[in-house]
Amino acid sequence: MEKKIDFKPDSYLIRSGNNFLGILNDIKRRPEDAANELGVSIEEINSIISGKQKISPSLIEKAVNIWPVNERDFYIVSDDCSSGILIMTSQDSIKSSRIMERAGKPYYEYRDTAMSKTAPFRPEWILELCKVENNDPENPKAQWNNGHFMHQFTYFIGEVNFYYKDPEGKKHVAIMNTGDSMYITPFTPHTFTTRDGASQNGLILALTYGSKLTGDIQQELSSLSLDCGSQYALDFTNHENASLSLLEYYFELSNLTKEKFAKRTNFSMETLADFFTKKKLPTFDELKIIAKALNVNSRDLMPNDLTESKVIVKTHDQCDHWKYPESGNYEFYELASTTALPHSKAFEIDVSSSEDLNLDLKVGLHQYVYNIGDSALTINWNYENKTYQKSLNPGDSAYIKPFVPHNFRGNGKILILRIGGKISGDSQRELSFVGRENTQRAISETMQWFDPKGSNS
């Protein structure tokens, strides 16, 4: 038997214990069952569940060898943002500086900016060290990457050329200046240079982030064969193909025959044939009938409203802007975004001095903040009934957890990128269906799925 190691209960161990209890509930094991099957004492199992003891790697190894679980199921996300907001100073960013060479010459200087273990941001400050004399997309000085798995929003500072390839492999160049922005989908090959004659090297804030496909989803896909996993990618190249792909996918899940489908919908076989050959797209009312017949929601059968480019470029003068809130503490400039990621929002925000103490900002998204101005700002916030105040100096960056009330005060300019992470969208809908009254157990399980003493209530 392994020697018991006692730990002072902390938030990580408590959450880890709740996670372990959730695993036992899912596979219908009582603590005594787990102790018996894992060959340890019931005291050790209860100590892990109560957050008094860390689960050991050797115990996890035993568990994955006898139960249908994976090692990663036992490890929880570390919360390095216990106050709700994490700040990285410009001095700390400078300490992370590293020069990346391409084709044997210095090409980029990279610096880290604010990142948290609780959020999918991977934002970088990148200085373009390569200068070009023209705007030719075929310029041999431009050294291309292979694209990457992360979505990327980029904010431009200075005179920067942004090179990218379209889906057909054709090279393009966009002439970018301060305040311009862009979004690219994963695996889009691209690169950046400084235009010759610029007073200083161009700079980008390359805010890369994972959305729904990273983490557990990617792991689930990787456990399938390439052929099977690839079939999850439907044809969304245009509205018609997307509509048909969704209809076919949910129809195949139902195992209905066309004849049975016709009876359920009261559509003729000819009408169904038109739907399945794209001769006709279902109207909204027809989609509701189809959804009812397939026992799904109408939204499940609806393609995106727009089929947008994989590269979206937006100059600063194209940005819509407005004052917020009514008091006008901020002026928002709406930067590049895509409707394919409805929970990703990017803004340049002018902050106006205010003595108003109201925490006038709160959104249910992960937020990245960078002070792109020349003056210091103050950020105030409240988290778990505690009030905080910190300075955000030029070049400082921050991460803000979802639903944290906060404000910015002073006179300056900030960049904000908001993303949904894993919870927004279908996960949020599922949690809402489970009900707010059950969120505590859904977030972190605290009780066994049944009472051994019995219950008649």
From Swiss-Prot:
DNA-binding region: 32-50, 258-277
Organism: Nitrosopumilus maritimus (strain SCM1)
CDD domains in the record: HTH_XRE
Top EC category: oxidoreductase
Sites where the protein binds Fe cation: 148, 190
EC number: 1.13.11.73
Domain HTH cro/C1-type: 23-74, 247-301
Keywords assigned: Dioxygenase, DNA-binding, Iron, Metal-binding, Oxidoreductase, Repeat
PROSITE patterns in alphabetical order: HTH_CROC1 (PS50943)
Pathway listed: Phosphorus metabolism; phosphonate biosynthesis
Phylogenetic lineage: Archaea, Nitrososphaerota, Nitrososphaeria, Nitrosopumilales, Nitrosopumilaceae
Family: Belongs to the non-heme iron-dependent dioxygenase family.
Pfam families to which the protein is assigned, alphabetical: HTH_3
Miscellaneous field: The existence of the methylphosphonate biosynthesis pathway in marine microbes may explain the supersaturation of the aerobic ocean with methane. Methane is probably released following degradation of methylphosphonate produced by MpnS.
Known function: Catalyzes the conversion of 2-hydroxyethylphosphonate into methylphosphonate in the methylphosphonate biosynthesis pathway.
GO biological process, one term: regulation of DNA-templated transcription
One MF annotation (Gene Ontology) recorded for this entry: ferrous iron binding
Cofactor(s) required, per the database record: Fe(2+)
Database matches in SUPFAM superfamilies: lambda repressor-like DNA-binding domains, RmlC-like cupins
Protein name: Methylphosphonate synthase
Catalytic reaction equation(s): 2-hydroxyethylphosphonate + O2 = methylphosphonate + hydrogencarbonate + H(+)
Database matches in SMART domains: HTH_XRE
Matches recorded under InterPro entries: Bact_TransReg_Diox, Cro/C1-type_HTH, Lambda_DNA-bd_dom_sf, RmlC-like_jellyroll, RmlC_Cupin_sf
Transmembrane segments: none
